[in-house]
Swiss-Prot record:
It comes from Xenopus laevis (African clawed frog). Its EC number is 1.5.1.2. This is Pyrroline-5-carboxylate reductase 3. Belongs to the pyrroline-5-carboxylate reductase family. It is found in: Cytoplasm.
Amino acid sequence: MAASPRVSLPVGCIGAGRMAQGILEGILHKGEITPQNVMVSAPTDRNLEKLKARGCCTSHDNRSVVSNCRVVFLATKPHIIPSVLQEIYPKVTADHLIISMAAGVTLETLEKNLPPGSKVIRMMPNLPCVLQEGAIVFSRGRCAGEVEADVFESLVRTCGLCVEVPQSCIDIHTGVSGSGVAYVYTFAEALADGAVKMGMPSALARQIVAQTLLGAGKMLLQSEEHPASLRADVCTPGGTTIFGLHELEKGGLRAAVMNAVEAATTRAMDMGRK
């Protein structure tokens, strides 16, 4: 792979689901790579139509993607990855950078099922990447160096936060951020339902809850303070917030959330052992 981190070479993606489309949209958002330089494969046209309309090249042949692109994202379901790797093996060269976003599939598994010396990156995004507000972590395989890391980061930076981590943190990221989006939606639904119970119209409740979560998240990011400190700022002695928090404590909210992260992380680890 060329020594420059600036990517103008064709980018491929095997798989065209919602996460793949989100990552590709982020890549195209920068404008450095045109849709004509993106090639995507999927078994059927159902998920390819939107990308085709965007101007991307599409195919039903995974090997064609690898033959035509030097950077290739693997965006299939985890249980499909072994067959995909077997299929593309003859086409992968030392010039390729293979990037997997499949939950639970380790770097060791990827490297074992690709030609020796293959440059591999394992990434884990989350759903807000489709709006360029995601959180991505990644780890490099043994043969992927700083150049490959720079290429990867230059591609996905517009999708949101992007951080290189030890591989041991990727399954944890799956549990806290990949799955965490669903926890937040569940909490948002409960907040809105509480407002509806007290008499607020449902549409208004959802709008206010969404803005509340957005504002709280921005404050957490921008202030760099511990969540407990920000929470304490909202709690006046004898006020409404401390009464509400007391009910959350009685319901075991924090323990339940911690258990959810543990369960999802453990599941991701189990998937990697299969």
